[in-house]
């Protein structure tokens, strides 16, 4: 649906979404534009490069996603970075609007970099973003909607008094960016956090303001590392100590150490391309973030030792509060793993992860992430496990009846005994990626590997494995979750690592573990242990050019495992930033269903 020239009301957008998905017929097995790697229900623009999610916000009954976008090509080009903009009524189907921000003024002449959206007390949203100015310094700017009554927020203006925050004298001019969503403290002052390298040390700084225009930096950083690597794309948000409801960034939740509220500080590390977080308490009296002593001792000040948002291919995550459903929702950039030449041929690069609801688990130290419930509106045909629910040692059971390239699968495994668990030495706990690489899906073990084979060819020469292993420690047991990409494609020039992470569950008590996997052509998102350990992967199998993908449950353990639950659904194709003819611009090879 083209938005230009139409009566752009919330009603019109909603009617369009309803008309597109009123049919209950099964979807095609190809993504919307026919390119074999293009996704069917993950967010991506019609063409070109995208990266960080910026300023996701729920405003006047609509979801807005702004994102880093190069409107001129499929590769990263900082000088052309703009803010792309799309709107949705359900976080699944999206309509593209014109760019919200383009590099036009001296204070952002070389790019409109990352930032956030804040809703002011009068209901007007304001963008704060990092501009790269004419001298290539990173400065902080604001922008306002041209018409605040427009529910789609189609046009934005950048005041001439920008930048509102120039580069401080002690801060590196090319390491001062990514302002967070702002919050009002209990003293009535606005605050936001921002990444910087100050006096040669990577730090998360806090600024305060009474009017959102004149800002003063807090004397002490919110948090600082011990080296010069900047922790970028910070996010600070409150979480309830109990329950799954999200909390807004208001004074009652973000300020002080209020009862029933904890806080999460998340950063993205450019040297590892991973997102890390810690659960602690933020106090707006002195703008400090503290963590429990036991966590500080275990993880220290090095961000790379903190917990990971995702143990796979995911970066620059950003959350927002969804007031409509009282939840906190996380977005993140998922980059390509093929070559730049492939991206140029396709005409696009980069996805957003499927939006995830986020809350604090009952232990109070880690986040739980789960796909937002709206994904269920795409469910069509239901799959069945062929051959029974007990999978013998070395067994393989196909999940039949659905298209394996566009699915939502949730499976639970029961383990009768832990007696056969392999021994794991303590030093192997430090590097789960390496442990998964050494113990791939084809390496038989005591309890595990067992899990799913996804995007698999009929002859199994190409397959992506998502699986678990249970290990015995000197003080109990631990569960390792892996995504093995080493056989995901026969194509040359593709990054095919093994991702790994430990799942914080009591396997000795539960004797069961769950896995949910979203499969969408070239992306596989997996959630282990009810969402306590998450892994995102990019896959580019060659077999989809001439045939269909298969989906299996496998078990390479020494004993049988029981599948106590299986819910597998084929998913319809969402309407994501489609053009006038309902299609997406693309290049390169098409998938099998459109070749025939």
Swiss-Prot record:
Q: Which residues form a coiled coil?
A: none
Q: Which Pfam families match?
A: Glyco_hydro_32C, Glyco_hydro_32N
Tissue-by-tissue expression: Expressed in roots. Weakly expressed in flowers.
Residues annotated to bind substrate: 49-52, 68, 76, 113-114, 177-178, 232
Keyword Hydrolase listed: yes
Q: Reaction catalysed?
A: Hydrolysis of terminal non-reducing beta-D-fructofuranoside residues in beta-D-fructofuranosides
The GO cellular component terms are: apoplast
Keywords for this entry? Apoplast, Cell wall, Disulfide bond, Glycoprotein, Glycosidase, Hydrolase, Secreted, Signal
The catalytic site is made up of: 52
Principal location class: secreted
Which GO terms fall under molecular function for this chain's record? beta-fructofuranosidase activity
- EC number of this enzyme: 3.2.1.26
Which class of enzymes does this protein belong to? hydrolase
User: Where is carbohydrate linked to this protein?
Assistant: 80, 335, 556
User: Gene3D superfamilies recorded for this chain?
Assistant: Exo-inulinase, domain 1 (2.60.120.560), Glycosyl hydrolase domain, family 43 (2.115.10.20)
Query: Which CDD domains does the entry link to?
Result: GH32_Fruct1-like
Its signal peptide is 1-25
Where it sits in the cell: the answer is: Secreted, Extracellular space, Apoplast; Secreted, Cell wall
Disulfide pairs?
Answer: 436-482
What domain of life? Eukaryota
UniProt lists the family membership as follows: Belongs to the glycosyl hydrolase 32 family.
Write down what this protein is called. Beta-fructofuranosidase, insoluble isoenzyme 6
The organism encoding this protein is Oryza sativa subsp. japonica (Rice)
The gene from which this protein is expressed is CIN6
């Amino acid at each position: 649906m083209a938005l230009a020239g139409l009566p752009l009301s919330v009603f019109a957008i909603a009617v369009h979404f309803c008309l597109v998905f009123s049919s209950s017929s099964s979807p095609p097995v190809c993504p919307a534009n026919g390119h074999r790697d293009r996704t069917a229900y993950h967010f991506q623009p019609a063409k070109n490069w995208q990266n960080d999610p910026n300023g996701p916000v729920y405003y006047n009954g609509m979801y807005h996603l702004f994102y880093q976008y190069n409107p001129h090509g499929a590769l990263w080009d900082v000088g052309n970075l703009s803010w792309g903009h799309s709107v949705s009524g359900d976080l699944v189907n999206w309509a593209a609007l014109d760019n919200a921000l383009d590099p036009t003024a001296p204070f952002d002449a070389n790019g409109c970099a990352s930032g956030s959206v804040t809703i002011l007390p009068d209901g007007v949203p304001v963008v704060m973003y990092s501009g790269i100015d004419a001298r290539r310094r990173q400065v902080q700017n604001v922008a306002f909607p041209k018409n605040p009554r427009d529910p789609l927020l189609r046009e934005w203006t950048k005041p001439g008094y920008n930048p509102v925050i120039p580069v401080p004298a002690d801060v590196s001019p090319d390491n001062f960016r990514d302002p967070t969503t702002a919050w009002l403290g209990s003293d009535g002052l606005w605050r936001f956090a921002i990444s910087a390298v100050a006096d040669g040390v990577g730090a998360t700084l806090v600024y305060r303001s009474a009017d959102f225009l004149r800002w003063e930096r807090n004397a002490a950083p919110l948090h600082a590392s011990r080296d010069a690597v900047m922790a970028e794309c910070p996010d600070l948000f409150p979480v309830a100590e109990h329950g799954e409801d999200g909390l807004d960034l208001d004074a009652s939740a973000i300020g002080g150490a209020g009862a029933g509220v904890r806080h999460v500080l998340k950063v993205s590390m450019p040297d590892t391309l991973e997102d890390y977080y810690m659960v602690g308490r933020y106090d707006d009296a002195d703008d400090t973030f503290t963590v429990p002593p036991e966590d500080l001792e275990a993880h220290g000040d090095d961000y790379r030792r903190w917990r990971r948002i995702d143990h796979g291919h995911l970066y620059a995550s950003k959350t927002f509060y969804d007031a409509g459903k009282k939840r906190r929702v996380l977005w993140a950039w998922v980059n390509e793993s093929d070559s730049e030449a492939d991206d140029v041929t396709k005409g696009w690069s980069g996805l957003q992860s499927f939006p995830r609801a986020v809350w604090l688990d009952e232990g109070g130290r880690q986040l739980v992430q789960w796909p937002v419930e709206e994904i269920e509106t795409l469910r069509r045909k239901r799959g069945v496990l062929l051959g029974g629910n007990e999978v013998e040692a070395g067994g393989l059971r196909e999940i039949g009846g659905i298209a394996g390239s566009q699915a939502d699968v949730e499976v639970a495994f029961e383990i009768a005994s832990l007696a056969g668990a392999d021994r794991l030495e303590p030093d192997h706990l430090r590097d789960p990626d390496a442990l998964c690489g050494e113990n791939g899906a084809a390496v038989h073990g005591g309890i595990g590997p067992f899990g799913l084979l996804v995007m698999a060819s009929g002859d199994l020469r190409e397959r992506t494995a998502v699986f678990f292993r249970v290990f015995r420690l000197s003080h109990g047991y631990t569960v390792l979750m892996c995504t093995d990409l080493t056989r995901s494609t026969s194509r040359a020039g593709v990054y095919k690592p093994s991702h790994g992470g430990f799942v914080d569950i009591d396997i000795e008590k539960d004797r069961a573990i769950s896995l949910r996997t979203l499969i969408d052509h070239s992306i596989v998102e997996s959630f282990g242990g009810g969402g306590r350990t998450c892994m995102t992967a990019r896959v580019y199998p060659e077999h989809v050019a001439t045939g269909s993908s298969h989906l299996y449950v496998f078990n390479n353990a020494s004993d049988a495992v029981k599948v106590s639950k299986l819910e597998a659904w084929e998913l319809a194709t969402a309407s994501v930033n489609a053009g006038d003819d309902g299609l997406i611009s693309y290049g390169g090879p098409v998938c099998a269903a459109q070749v025939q």
